[in-house]
Amino acid sequence: MLQVQGLQIVMKKDLRQLLQGFTFSLQPGDKAAIIGEEGNGKSTLLKLLYDPALVEEYVEWSGTVQKDGMILGYLSQELTPQEGEMTAYEFCCQDPAFWEYTPGELAEAAKKLGFPMEWFYGDRKMKSFS
């Protein structure tokens, strides 16, 4: 279970408050959506939930975050120059978790996401995807 209680996030540079008193919990299998205008802290919230060290340079935060055995992942919105030159297959191969799945399981996941398998095994570079 992922449980967040009384989360407050404040930007260090201008003291702008992104969240105040934010509380929620997710059980295994639950789904959630974070919707908001650009620049209002959606990515900051996700980074903080994944690893608070990712945001410590630019925000102050308080509250509690309990992951209780949940495995979280975070995929940055921007690729490094090296990642941009990789194919989708090369990019995925970097993550040890990738090797825990059979080709059939990967194909099923790609199908659910609407991701054509030829994109995965083709020569198209990561930087060309939107």
Language-model features, listed with the residues they occupy:
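Conserved beta-strand
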Residues: 4-7, 14-30, 63
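The feature captures the beta-strand-to-loop junction immediately N-terminal to the Walker
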Residues: 35-37
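ATP-binding Walker
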Residues: 40
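Helix-to-loop junction immediately C-terminal to a conserved catalytic motif
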Residues: 50
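Conserved ABC transporter NBD signature motif
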Residues: 58-72
